[in-house]
């Protein structure tokens, strides 16, 4: 049975792990790194680059290099958070026909799950290369505060990448799994997981208990902000640099996409450097030019300056911590361990703020980049039956309910309810002889339904005529272990029923997902074709170079017609190398090999002659000593 891999699909970086021989193995990618940038670039020749290769060319291809797409997944174009990103991203964010936020590259509209699927495909391939077998199943992590639409969209991304998503689990929960199974501490412990990643922030309060030799992980509460992370920290630095440069040079870099991409790279680098040093220098020659000539950017940033720029962002993480503690029904002093997850938690100011709130130093023995993928791999081994000593009880992060008379949100399932769960409630009609009811489903904490996230709606029709308040409509909410919602409505009088799995009320339709799966398969073939063509070109190029070199050395030993034939074959191969397909190049390679046969024979004959001459010279050079005497000896036997 093939293994279920664990994937941390991050905003900035992704990571893949697997349980191997009872141990979690974080798998290195083709570039030798344990994490992969969640960046996808679409090239003009149709090739798709993922990870470090995509990141390397971002400066020269900013409009077609997509990063931080996780911030858009499962979101509406009109959402405030999306509108804010439109002005900041060098690539285009566009409105899809269904109202979702999509991106555009090479003149084509692309759904965020498609972009995420490209990253997931790279993680799948990384795992397959390590395991030496095909991988078809995965556990994928999401921020704990992701709503239903965002979870569905992540599941869709997995399907497009050719993976059956066995479970969607929350990132802080996964980190707690990795921490809890790695440590030998006995007894019950309450831990806080503070997860500040590239695009999202989560905090979860989790109880780890030993129950009859089994480790039980129970999430008591979760809270967060799905639009707060390292990308926002980078943006503060970029805005500061743009402001300083404008003051100094009078040039506004915010409209120059090429400059912005270089600034993005420099800001991220500066932020990382300032976690270990007090000062860093941003040096970007030829950042732009005006009538007076090229302009260079040179700016020193201190750690204190960075902390001042991002202080408000760090402060924004504390309120969710407060709410999570309150919802869990615990005191801060009852928290035994604080675990930091996500690259941003390496920033000293973040660690300081966490210590200030929780009153204790956070643990330093958890790898913030790898813990989430490790936990996902552990959950994968639980689902495949390899591990039986772990029980995971997660929660739904936000309340779920329906809109009732007066636009009120009637909550069916409260936030932080352990999942899977099921809840039913009976409602009735608002008007006399009402033939149908519309069930509108919402997710959120506001009292008025319109203030919450609309997840979808459906009708229950064929209600027999009756005075208002008389028909009995039973509405049932059912959340599965992935945190995905199924809703049904039943007329108790007639037994008529209608049910839906809540798809994001836009989201991707089944047809669209199938089309994207087929596109992905076709792309895999196209990628294979491009790679094969590149290899053929390289080999042909090497042959041209080697033949030319040999022709220079041995050409005079050939007949004029033989030499001309080789030169003609080289020219034909070079012509076809520019834009020919694999078959055309192969044919010309064959022709050059045939034409070069005589040249090969001459080279071989020359080498043989040279070796013979060398051997002869060596034999002649051996010294002859006339005073050598043959030894004469006789065996003497001793008495025993």
Swiss-Prot record:
<keyword id="KW-0597">Phosphoprotein</keyword>
<dbReference type="InterPro" id="IPR013126">
    <property type="entry name" value="Hsp_70_fam"/>
</dbReference>
<keyword id="KW-0346">Stress response</keyword>
<dbReference type="InterPro" id="IPR043129">
    <property type="entry name" value="ATPase_NBD"/>
</dbReference>
<dbReference type="GO" id="GO:0140662">
    <property type="term" value="F:ATP-dependent protein folding chaperone"/>
</dbReference>
<comment type="similarity">
    <text>Belongs to the heat shock protein 70 family.</text>
</comment>
<dbReference type="Pfam" id="PF00012">
    <property type="entry name" value="HSP70"/>
</dbReference>
<dbReference type="InterPro" id="IPR018181">
    <property type="entry name" value="Heat_shock_70_CS"/>
</dbReference>
<protein>
    <recommendedName>
        <fullName>Chaperone protein DnaK</fullName>
    </recommendedName>
</protein>
<keyword id="KW-0547">Nucleotide-binding</keyword>
<comment type="function">
    <text>Acts as a chaperone.</text>
</comment>
<keyword id="KW-0143">Chaperone</keyword>
<keyword id="KW-0067">ATP-binding</keyword>
<feature type="compositionally biased region" description="Basic and acidic residues">
    <location>
        <begin position="619"/>
        <end position="640"/>
    </location>
</feature>
<feature type="region of interest" description="Disordered">
    <location>
        <begin position="614"/>
        <end position="640"/>
    </location>
</feature>
<dbReference type="InterPro" id="IPR012725">
    <property type="entry name" value="Chaperone_DnaK"/>
</dbReference>
<dbReference type="InterPro" id="IPR029048">
    <property type="entry name" value="HSP70_C_sf"/>
</dbReference>
<dbReference type="GO" id="GO:0051082">
    <property type="term" value="F:unfolded protein binding"/>
</dbReference>
<feature type="modified residue" description="Phosphothreonine; by autocatalysis">
    <location>
        <position position="200"/>
    </location>
</feature>
<dbReference type="GO" id="GO:0005524">
    <property type="term" value="F:ATP binding"/>
</dbReference>
<dbReference type="InterPro" id="IPR029047">
    <property type="entry name" value="HSP70_peptide-bd_sf"/>
</dbReference>
């Amino acid at each position: 049975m093939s293994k279920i891999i664990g994937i941390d699909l991050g905003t900035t970086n992704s990571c893949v792990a697997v349980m191997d021989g009872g141990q979690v193995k974080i798998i290195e990618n083709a570039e030798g790194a344990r994490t992969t940038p969640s960046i996808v670039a679409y090239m003009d020749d149709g090739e798709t680059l993922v990870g470090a290769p995509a990141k390397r060319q971002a400066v020269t291809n900013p409009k077609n290099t997509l990063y931080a797409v996780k911030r858009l997944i499962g979101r509406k174009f009109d959402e405030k958070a999306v509108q804010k990103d439109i002005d900041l991203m060098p690539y285009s964010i566009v409105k899809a026909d269904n109202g979702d936020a999509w991106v555009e590259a090479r003149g084509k509209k692309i759904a965020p799950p498609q972009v995420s699927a490209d990253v997931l495909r790279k993680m799948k391939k990384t795992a397959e290369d390590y395991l030496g077998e095909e991988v078809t199943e995965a556990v994928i992590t999401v921020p704990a505060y992701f709503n239903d639409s965002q979870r569905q969209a992540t599941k869709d991304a997995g399907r497009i990448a050719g993976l059956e998503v066995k479970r969607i689990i929350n990132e802080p929960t996964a980190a707690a799994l990795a921490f809890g199974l790695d440590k030998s501490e006995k007894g019950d412990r309450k831990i806080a997981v503070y997860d500040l990643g590239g695009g999202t922030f989560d905090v979860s309060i989790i109880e780890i208990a030993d129950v009859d030799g089994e480790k039980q992980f129970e999430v008591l509460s979760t809270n967060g902000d799905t639009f707060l992370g390292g990308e926002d920290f980078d943006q503060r630095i970029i805005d500061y640099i743009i402001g300083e440069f404008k003051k100094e040079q009078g040039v506004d870099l915010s409209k120059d996409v090429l400059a912005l991409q270089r600034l993005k790279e420099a800001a991220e680098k500066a932020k990382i450097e300032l976690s270990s040093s007090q000062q860093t220098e941003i040096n970007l020659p030829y950042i732009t030019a005006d009538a007076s000539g090229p302009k260079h950017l040179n700016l020193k940033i201190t750690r204190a300056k960075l902390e001042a720029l991002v202080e408000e962002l760090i402060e924004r993480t504390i309120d969710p911590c407060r709410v999570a503690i309150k919802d869990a029904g615990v005191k801060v002093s009852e928290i035994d361990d604080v675990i930091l997850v996500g690259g941003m938690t390496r920033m000293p100011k973040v660690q300081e703020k966490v210590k200030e709130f929780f009153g204790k130093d956070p643990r330093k023995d958890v790898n913030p980049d790898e813990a989430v993928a490790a936990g996902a791999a552990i959950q994968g081994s639980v689902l495949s039956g390899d591990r039986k000593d772990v029980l995971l009880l997660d929660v739904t992060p936000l309340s779920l309910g329906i809109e009732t008379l007066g636009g009120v949100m009637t909550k069916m399932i409260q936030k932080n309810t352990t999942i899977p769960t099921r809840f039913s409630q009976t409602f009735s009609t608002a008007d006399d002889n009402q033939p149908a009811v519309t069930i509108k489903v919402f997710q959120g904490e506001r009292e008025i339904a319109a203030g919450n996230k609309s997840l979808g709606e459906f009708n229950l029709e064929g209600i027999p005529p009756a005075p208002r308040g008389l028909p009995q409509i039973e509405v049932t909410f059912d959340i599965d272990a992935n945190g995905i919602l199924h809703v049904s409505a039943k007329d108790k009088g007639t037994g008529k029923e209608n049910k839906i799995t809540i798809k994001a009320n836009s989201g991707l339709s089944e047809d669209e997902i199938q089309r994207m799966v087929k596109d992905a398969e076709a792309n895999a073939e196209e990628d294979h074709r491009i790679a094969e063509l590149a290899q053929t070109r390289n080999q042909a190029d090497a042959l041209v170079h080697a033949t030319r070199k040999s022709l220079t050395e041995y050409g005079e030993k050939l007949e004029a017609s033989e030499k001309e034939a080789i030169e003609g074959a080289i020219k034909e191969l070079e012509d076809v190398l520019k834009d020919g397909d694999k078959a055309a190049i192969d044919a010309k390679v064959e022709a050059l090999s045939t034409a070069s046969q005589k040249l090969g024979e001459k080279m071989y004959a020359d080498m043989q002659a040279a070796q013979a001459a060398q051997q002869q010279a060596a034999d002649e050079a051996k010294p002859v000593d006339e005073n050598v005497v043959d030894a004469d000896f006789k065996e003497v036997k001793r008495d025993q």
